[in-house]
Amino acid sequence: MRTTLVPTAVVASLLAPTAAHADTGEDAIPRLTDSRGRALTLRGWNVEDKAHRGEQALSAITEKHFRDMRAKGFDFARLLVFWDDLEPRQGQYSQAYLRKIGRVLGWAEKYDVKVLIDAHQDVFGPAFGHRGIPEWATRTDGLPFTPHPDDWFAEYFEPAVQRAFTHLYEDADLRRAQARMWRVLADRFRDHPAVLGYDLINEPMGELREGEDLPTAARRIEREQLTPMYNRLADAVRSADRDGWVFVEPTPIVGEGVPTGLGRIDDPKVVYAPHFYNSGMEAGADYDPAAGWIESYEQAVTRYPKEYKVPVVVGEWGPLNNSLPNMNRFYREAMASLGRYSSGWAGYVWCYGGGYCAVDGAGTFRTNKELTAEPYAEAVAGTVRSTSYDPATGVYRLVYDSAGRHRSRLTELSLPPGAWQVAARGRAIVLRRTEGRAWVLAAPGARVTVTATRR
């Protein structure tokens, strides 16, 4: 660690108060903030173990995951946890599973990675050969289910799966059980320094009614079932944790550029957490720049946070076949789009191998995924005016108005591997640098420009 020592007189001059101002438009999407009021940017990956259960649960996640993510400049992990592992029998919560979650959170804390605890489900849960809601909480009314091994997402449209979602949303005892599950998690991890918040359910779906097309059904499910569910679960979390952020997802249909039907969630710390997937690319197609998918997605997905004034964090994104001819352009355009409206994202998925994995067995980025590693400001002590990064020149620029005298004025930068020169102008100094990170101290109310240049 290389530390730059700053003379006391210089620091004192930076702490002298000056006038501050902010420029916020009516359509501005709020930024996610930390406990000190700093504007956060989250860049990271999903971390998961879907293969192991019981005594082996979470065993595929190791300390190496967090060490390697932080070494490449990422500060965020969306940790998948499963209700079927937490409560394998109704009313009996696995203390061993909670300890395993705690061990993973300990590694995140060690490497200064913020964690979102995600109550994950795929195709509802184990009753249908996947993970998520326990079998004891799965009610199908005897409706049929046919597996689709070559297209697992199609299983969401099987009658038994759709009916199971309806019961989860509507049955009073299942509502209470889901709320209790969240109280257990929030009570256990509310004081853990690595925990940023709670993603209440992954990619929720529901039951289509006769004559409905998919967008119409999705908006109805979001409006009539997901909105009240999220309000119930937010209340459950708040009964144990008053400070963590509550992340709420629309149905995955937003990936088709369909605005959500979600209503207001009555909680002061809500984050809108859509996923960013295109059905054609998920089926193996290349990115088609002429189709305008990114533009239509961005237009649709920003309506909710603008209306309800909540921050956005994209919980999953990234194509399966990332080495196709147009994927380099996709990653560049996707990164630019995400930077325009979100407070961050978690790519899918940090693992060592093929498929969706971010890196190969040697820990090297797989084709085009290196484009996700950019300089960014993890925490800005003030109001962000603009950020930009030009990969061609290797220049990152942040302009912000620093906070007032009674608030934090320490801004933190994350830098990808390599040699970087960091400079600050406007009554600000680069207080300290280490490999991959830098800290900037600014006078209160100053207009500050920070530049990081790849050498």
PLM segments and residue spans:
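Aromatic- and acid-rich polysaccharide-binding/catalytic face
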Residues: 196, 202, 250, 261-290
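C-terminal beta-strand-rich structural cap/linker in extracellular carbohydrate-active enzymes
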Residues: 409, 433-455
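Acidic (Asp/Glu)-rich catalytic clusters
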Residues: 66-73, 187-193, 261-271, 302-307, ...
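Secretory targeting and sorting signals
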Residues: 1-22
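Surface-exposed beta-strand/loop patches in extracellular or lumenal glycoproteins
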Residues: 399-419, 448-449
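Substrate-binding cleft of secreted/luminal carbohydrate-active enzymes
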Residues: 43, 273, 294-368
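Active-site mouth of glycoside hydrolases
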Residues: 27-42, 46-245, 250-258
